[in-house]
Amino acid sequence: MNLKKYTDYALRVLIFTGLKSDQELANIKEIAEVYQISQEHLRKVVHELTKMELVVTIRGRNGGIKLAKPASEINIGLLIRQLENDFVLLECFDKGTNHCVISPGCTLKHVINKALVAFFKVLEEYTLEDLIKNEEELLALMGIEKV
C-alpha cells in the first residue's frame, strides 16, 4: 500500500511549516528547494491545505505560509483519510470496477478492510506535533538554522 505523492507532499509541507516559529512564514520556494519537489506541485498542495483550513497563506512580498492551528490539533490519521479519499486496495473494494467472480463469498476483502481500519486507528493517535518533536534533527537534515 502506498500513499499518494500528493499526501506525502502535504505531510512534508505541514512538517516544514510546523517547524517555523509563530512569527516566521514558510514559502513554497524554500520548501521546494529543501525537499527537491516542483513548486507547481507544492502550490496545488498548499491550495488544498488552505481549503482544509490547515494552513493560511499571506500574499505579498513578505507573504508566505503558516499553520492555521496549533500542530497539536492537526491529526495525521484524519488528514490522510481526507487526502486519500479512494483507498481501493483491491478490485473488490470498488463496485464499479469489480469483476472478481469470487467476490460475493470471499473473505479477503474483510481481512484487508480490518487491516485498513487498524492502519488509520494507529495514525489517528498522532498529531503534527508528534512528527516535529525532533525539531533540531529535522532542521539539521533540511539544512536550516533556527532563527
Swiss-Prot record:
Residues 28-51 bind DNA. Its cofactor is [2Fe-2S] cluster. Residues 2-133 form the HTH rrf2-type domain. It holds the Pfam family Rrf2. Binds 1 [2Fe-2S] cluster per subunit. It comes from the Bacteria. PROSITE patterns: HTH_RRF2_2 (PS51197). GO terms for cellular component: cytosol. One of its GO terms (molecular function) is 2 iron, 2 sulfur cluster binding. [2Fe-2S] cluster binds at residues 92, 100, 106. Keywords: 2Fe-2S, DNA-binding, Iron, Iron-sulfur, Metal-binding, Transcription, Transcription regulation. Nitric oxide-responsive transcriptional regulator. PANTHER family: HTH-TYPE TRANSCRIPTIONAL REPRESSOR NSRR, WINGED HELIX-TURN-HELIX TRANSCRIPTIONAL REGULATOR, RRF2 FAMILY. NCBIfam families: rrf2_super. This is HTH-type transcriptional regulator NsrR. It comes from Oceanobacillus iheyensis (strain DSM 14371 / CIP 107618 / JCM 11309 / KCTC 3954 / HTE831). The lineage of its organism: Bacteria, Bacillati, Bacillota, Bacilli, Bacillales. The gene is nsrR.
